[in-house]
Amino acid sequence: MLGMIKNSLFGSVETWPWQVLSKGDKEEVAYEERACEGGKFATVEVTDKPVDEALREAMPKVAKYAGGTNDKGIGMGMTVPISFAVFPNEDGSLQKKLKVWFRIPNQFQSDPPAPSDKSVKIEEREGITVYSMQFGGYAKEADYVAQATRLRAALEGTATYRGDIYFCTGYDPPMKPYGRRNEIWLLKT
């Protein structure tokens, strides 16, 4: 636990590598098309709980893993954004299922420490191309749903993306009160 606190206060923060392919602006929605690198990710999946409740369960597990709760006792530092996959119903509401993805820092990509918590899994993920839109505040499930609706409306007729999944991302620690950065990522098809 001390490693996690030390790491969150003094540790490094690495940005998940991506390249901006294009930018757009429609109906007061600014967005980017990005190619995001793949790699190894620590993941936690939670089902049968609303998104906000599932996040309160999953995020500390990922943070503890990054902070040193692993077989090597190494605090790795964080990568941003932390993302989580959500699965919309036909009406736009979200299913009671999510999967948190934490990209393991580059220094540990070739040989990541094994998680001590069995609910944390290490997975290899291919690169993805996304349509991304940024927004601020302390985001909750309703905010992600509303922002995803705005991004879909802005992309209507100009882009194709998956409708069965999208990513919600955050860049800031929970204790940051102002200037928070969140994003919605729709997966390009």
Curated annotation (Swiss-Prot):
Annotated keywords: Cytoplasm
* Main location per the UniProt record: cytoplasm
Pfam families on file? SOUL (PF04832)
One annotated Gene Ontology cellular component of this protein: extracellular region
Q: State the InterPro entries in the record.
A: Reg_factor_effector_dom_sf, SOUL_haem-bd
Q: Which domain of life is it from?
A: Eukaryota
Give the location in the cell: Cytoplasm
In its keyword annotation, does this UniProt entry include Cytoplasm?
yes
> Which terms does the record give in the GO molecular function aspect?
heme binding
What GO biological process terms are annotated to this protein in UniProt? circadian rhythm
| Annotated function | May bind free porphyrinogens that may be present in the cell and thus facilitate removal of these potentially toxic compound. Binds with a high affinity to one molecule of heme or porphyrins. It binds metalloporphyrins, free porphyrins and N-methylprotoporphyrin with similar affinities.
Which PANTHER family does the entry mention?
HEME-BINDING PROTEIN 1, HEME-BINDING PROTEIN-RELATED
- Domain free text: Forms a distorted beta-barrel structure, with two helices that are packed against the outer surface of the barrel. Porphyrins are expected to bind to a hydrophobic patch on the outer surface of the beta-barrel structure.
- Subunit structure of this entry? Monomer.
In the record, the note on similarity to other proteins reads: Belongs to the HEBP family.
**The name this protein goes by in its record:** Heme-binding protein 1
Species of provenance: Homo sapiens (Human)
